[in-house]
A protein has these predicted regions:
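A conserved glycine-rich beta-strand in the N-terminal activation segment of trypsin-fold
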Residues: 18-40, 46, 64-67, 154, ...
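Catalytic-histidine neighborhood of serine endopeptidases
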Residues: 31, 38-89, 104
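A short, polar/charged loop-to-alpha-helix boundary motif
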Residues: 55-58, 174-192
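Residue-level recognition of beta-strand microenvironments
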Residues: 37-39, 71-73, 132-133, 160, ...
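Flexible, gly/ser-rich surface segments that form the specificity/activation loops bordering the active-site cleft
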Residues: 90-141, 148-153, 168-181
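Protease-domain processing segments flanking chymotrypsin-fold serine proteases, especially trypsin-like
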Residues: 1-29
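Terminal peptide-recognition signature
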Residues: 34, 41, 45, 68, ...
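A structural micro-motif recognizing beta-strand termini
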Residues: 24, 39, 61, 82-90, ...
Length: 194
């Protein structure tokens, strides 16, 4: 019942069809997902999706592509902030961050299935929080029971209100940065808390 989930979270499938980092011509390669934050044309993504790139473009759901530049990269947490080179053009609606996100074990969370963005209604994946603090020495990483496929790192993690509470990292990517996560269950994924 994706329609019910979209309605409950006050979301629209088109809110997600805009944020694919994708090729625009031969030689370009699609490498990840991201989402707009704020009204200045900034995007969040997982930094490995732009690793080794000299030029980066985003492709919107209507096929339009725009160049972006790297603003900041947070190496430890695998986060990159990108900015549209021409933010004066019409921008998609940015996602709303939860002011005071709560992370409690067994709380329900949602993620967009970015692998199915070519369909008119991309699906939402529903999961739950397994560990509020997945690392002993940091309160920034949450462990999830949520299906996250390769290439979906950099997408938003939503709460029941449809607000962003984190940035999703697939298991293998999170484990490369944090050795404590090596023993995570097979179905686990992770998120950087917002």
């Amino acid at each position: 019942n994706e329609e019910k989930a979209y309605k409950k979270l006050d979301l629209n499938p088109d809110d997600f069809r805009i944020d694919i980092l994708a090729p625009i011509k031969r030689g370009w390669k699609s490498s990840g997902v991201g989402f707009f934050i704020g009204k200045q044309g900034n995007l969040l993504t997982a930094s490995p999706s732009i690793m080794g790139s000299n030029k980066i473009r985003v492709r919107f759901s209507n096929g339009r592509t725009e160049p972006v530049k790297l603003v900041q990269k947070f190496i430890v947490y695998k986060i990159a902030i990108l900015k549209l080179e021409n933010p004066n053009k019409e921008l998609p609606k940015p996602l709303v961050f939860e002011d005071t996100p709560h992370f409690k074990e067994d709380n329900t969370v949602y993620a967009m299935d970015f692998l199915k963005l070519q369909t008119p209604n991309p699906s939402l994946s529903k999961g739950k929080i397994l560990k509020e603090n997945a690392l002993e020495n940091s309160d920034k990483i949450v462990q999830l029971d949520l299906a996250v496929q390769k290439g979906q790192s950099g997408g938003p993690l939503f709460n029941n209100d449809g607000n962003v509470i984190g940035l999703i990292l697939e298991k293998s990517l999170a484990q490369k940065s944090f050795s404590y996560l090596k023993d995570a269950p097979a179905n686990a994924s992770f998120a950087i808390k917002s």
